[in-house]
Amino acid sequence: MKTIKTIIAAALFLFGAQAIADEGTVRVLMTTSQGEISIDLYLDKAPVTAANFLQLVENGDMDGGSFYRVVTYENDRGSPKIEVIQGGLGDASEGFEAIEHESTEQTGILHTDGVISMARGAVGTASTEFFICIGDQPGLDYGQPRNADGLGFAAFGKVVSGMDIVRKIQGLPADGPTESDYTKGQILTQPVSIGRVRRAD
């Protein structure tokens, strides 16, 4: 009986994953205090990561989040240096379930200009925090040295409108408090609020 239940559960999971992938690309609109950003989520290419973000959107969990960190070639202390803006729920992210890591090798979504990807510490710890690439950032892809484990970050979509807003956010003053020398000069003095994120279709 237990085996049958396991088979049924696995079948339902696969059916759900296929249903998500069948949606292909879903566009979401992110309204911030600096302007609007439109993002395409690639559910067919990154079904786990994109579906997680879409679920956060549909649940209203991303509403009230913020962009709080900006990384430039001048203030970055990693190697290779990158340029991104990071956002999400920040301290409010506790309690959200982490997701499986989908590498760029699996999805084929590379970290090019405008690509949105999940921030993480160890593999399999990503949940609500994300970043948007400014310019091409190949050092964030699978097999590259930016992350010590070599697995890169999980890209899952791309900005299709509003990169001017992304760059505007990156240029804001960043002398906010931080407990880490690594992020000194990267924390926005005034975080950019995310008022609402919703499906555009």
PLM regions with names:
Residues 1-8:
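Bacterial N-terminal signal peptides that target proteins for export
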Residues 8-14:
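Hydrophobic helical h-region of N-terminal Sec-dependent signal peptides
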Residues 16-201:
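Cyclophilin-like peptidyl-prolyl cis-trans isomerases
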